[in-house]
Amino acid sequence: MAGTARHDREMAIQSKKKLSTATDPIERLRLQCLARGSAGIKGLGRVFRIMDDNNNRTLDFKEFLKGLNDYAVVMEKEEAEELFQRFDRDGSGTIDFNEFLLTLRPPMSRARKEVIMKAFRKLDKTGDGVITIEDLREVYNAKHHPKYQNGEWTEEQVFRKFLDNFDSPYDKDGLVTPEEFMNYYAGVSASIDTDVYFIIMMTTAWKL
């Protein structure tokens, strides 16, 4: 994705800086994820998804804590408890991790969300609600990538690196859900100040 490597570095530095003063548990977790770059929040989502053995999309506190530890999130148990309780609104002892990830995403304008979903729909050729790696390969324009432009990477390397953003090293299922796509671009979005630049970047990369 054109320009995102630089944005990623800047965002990581800014996030680490903000982390030293942030007190809200949600903000602190969000910053820890963003300090890893655009794919940080999506990566945490993958960890939770792998742990969700029975596919009910919920986690109890023990699983939640294990997920944070597996993702090497630095957080006191008390802070994790406070975070968990905020999402366990009905006091059932479980949280819906989709709702949790939704809150964790950096806020985005409607215009940004619309262009992200427009790109998703274009890529989802079969209309079955998931994008396959093959779908991406057909549409993603690698020639806009700065490392391709300066001769550092081949087109194939750009694809591989880009697809790695969507696929977890522990769970390479080759499928990208709307949530994963949105989580990834919420991270990219956090590093880009203006809607106009974000929309131009999406339109160019996905030929919208």
From Swiss-Prot:
Ca(2+) 1 binds at D52, N54, N56, T58, E63. GO terms for cellular component: cytoplasm. Ca(2+) 2 binds at D88, D90, S92, T94, E99. The gene is Capsl. It is found in: Cytoplasm. Coiled coil: none annotated. Keywords: Calcium, Cytoplasm, Metal-binding, Repeat. It comes from the Eukaryota. Residues 39-74, 75-110, 111-146, 154-191 form the EF-hand domain. This is Calcyphosin-like protein. SMART domains: EFh. InterPro entries: Ca-bind_SignalingProt, EF-hand-dom_pair, EF_Hand_1_Ca_BS, EF_hand_dom. Its main location: cytoplasm. PROSITE patterns: EF_HAND_1 (PS00018), EF_HAND_2 (PS50222). The lineage of its organism: Eukaryota, Metazoa, Chordata, Craniata, Vertebrata. GO terms for molecular function: calcium ion binding.
